[in-house]
Amino acid sequence: MSQLSAVPLKMTLQVDMQAQLAAIIDSTFYQVSSVFIDDLAAVNDMRNRSLMEADASVSNLEALLEYCKTLFALIAKFPDRQIEFTWFETLGHKAYGKTSNLWKFELFNVIYNIGAVKSLLASSMGNDELKEACRYLQESAGCFQYILSAMERELESVIDEKTIRAVLNLMLAQAQECCWARALRDAMKHSPIARLALQVSNFYEEAHRYARISPVIRTKLVKYINEKSFYFAAVAHYRHALHFEEKQQYGNAVRSLNEAQEKIKGAGWGPEVLPFEKELNDTLNTLQRDNDLIYLQHIPSQCPVINPVSMVKPILIDLLSTGTQKIHLFRNLLPIDVIESSAAFNIRQDKYVEDYVKSPLVALNKLLHNSLPENEALPGMKHLTEEEFDIYAKTLAGLNEFSSQLGERLTVIKSLIDGATTRLPAEANHHADQDNSKDIVEEYNKRIVTLQGYLRQGEEITRETTQIFETVDRDLLTTQLQLAATNNPTMRKVEALTKERYDYIAEVEKKSLQNRILPSLVSNYKETGSLDFEPIFQEHLKMFKKDIEYVQLGKKRNAELIAELNAEEGEESGKIKRLSPRDIQIQDFKHSLHLLEQVKENIEEGQVFYEDLKESIGVLHEDVTDFLNKS
């Protein structure tokens, strides 16, 4: 068997991983790098040992595998675009570098070197180690296959796909060649040897298809791969001819030898080619003479087909097939994802409390208060300070100012559109898409009319809200209430339940703040290494189960109290009752408070409305500006 061709190791520039990783920790994590000083030094030493050597030894392979395992862990913990890595291609006449700040660029080049070392180890093995060499070559192919399958578009400019496909098929070709050589050594029949050889040729042919268009691979290697493809095609047809000779199918045998003779012309002048070519020619001359004089069999115009058989495939090494493995380095360093997930879950937890505890309890209180007689004070009803009342006036004034600014911006956009409209006829001779420009301007005019309509609606609602606010009795709402406690037992129950619920809301909010999910996420991550935290969050929310039950019980208590209030109102409905000054004060206060609540709701909705309108106007402004710049 001829000497195998190995993939040379890529070279890389040295990187101070210790300093750069420390800087990342200090700038982007919630921890300090000094805690991880030993881990940082270990990573730095690991990269230097595995990548700065160009030899193909088992110890170097082990160092590469260890660093590769570490890289998987670093990718899970550290963000991209922080460290620049430079690697040099070595398959060409001269090495040239590619640089990227993506972790996967570093990872893929390390995996490439693992594949290269395995190919170098295979090439150093003798004919008595064909099985081991075949395994190494398939694992080398597995490394290149992994790179292809995990390649992202962002890396296509720094890792050439055609080159990877070329070396992948080169490794498979040589692994198949080992199987062919073992078959020869074991004196297998000619037919299976022919099928094995043709698949060797096919792998070399596929490798050549990519190698010849690779910007990296040197011409000499491209020529070598092509010649190997022709050589093994010739070998396959030669062995097929011997198979036909054994079966006394001399016409097919001669035709197969003719095909082999054609193929060997492209096989170059390698040490194995010349003796094989002589053997091939001698065999053809003998068989052709015997067939012409003795057997007289028809020689077909088409060469008999050989069905190739593949005995090899890319084999993923354990490290690549199992994915991320646990390592002790940076075990206590929490990835940014953990902190960000914690923050996101805190927001969801607060919303959960709001939606399923606080809002329902507030709604139950409101429903209960709406069932009170008009002359009964609302539980917890109190006056506003002058400052609190003035906030409403200032906010309304701010809405009016915001509305005016939006109107001015629409006026500016309208003037831009009008200017574009006047220019269109003058520029008609310079633009082939004149009609299209008119359609665009017309569409912009429709959009601005729509936005102006929305703005008028908002201004009208703001005016109505201002009018409502002006009817609110400021003096009444800002004067401290002096009301005697009620003697009505049902009202006392309402007051007690109202206070209980607001106290309960405060306790639940306190419980939520004191029981954040971060400790659970940290514990789960350290135990499993997984960043899938949704199941943990769902389990975490179960601490509010009793609070949800309290809300459900509150609905029943509400119904009972409302029934009592309705019964009392029914008893009093037939009686003539004179309103006391206290009753009148309460009714007036509740009326003004209701108006102020309406003003508050309108203000909140108005703020959202104007912000959305501002965004839509901004989009229109950008579209119009882009159109004018292009026209």
Swiss-Prot record:
Organism: Eremothecium gossypii (strain ATCC 10895 / CBS 109.51 / FGSC 9923 / NRRL Y-1056)
Task performed by this protein: Required for the proteolytic cleavage of the transcription factor RIM101 in response to alkaline ambient pH. May act as a scaffold protein that recruits the calpain-like protease RIM13 via VPS32 to its substrate RIM101.
InterPro entries listed in its UniProt record: ALIX_V_dom, BRO1_dom, BRO1_sf
GO biological process: invasive growth in response to glucose limitation; protein processing; sporulation resulting in formation of a cellular spore
Coiled coil location: none
Subunit structure of this chain's protein: Interacts with RIM101 by binding to its two YPX[LI] motifs.
Family to which the UniProt record says this protein belongs: Belongs to the palA/RIM20 family.
Listed PROSITE patterns: BRO1
CDD domains the UniProt entry points to: BRO1_ScRim20-like, V_Alix_like
Name this polypeptide is given: pH-response regulator protein palA/RIM20
Pfam families: ALIX_LYPXL_bnd (PF13949), BRO1 (PF03097)
GO CC terms: endosome; peroxisome
Domain BRO1, first and last residues per copy: 3-368
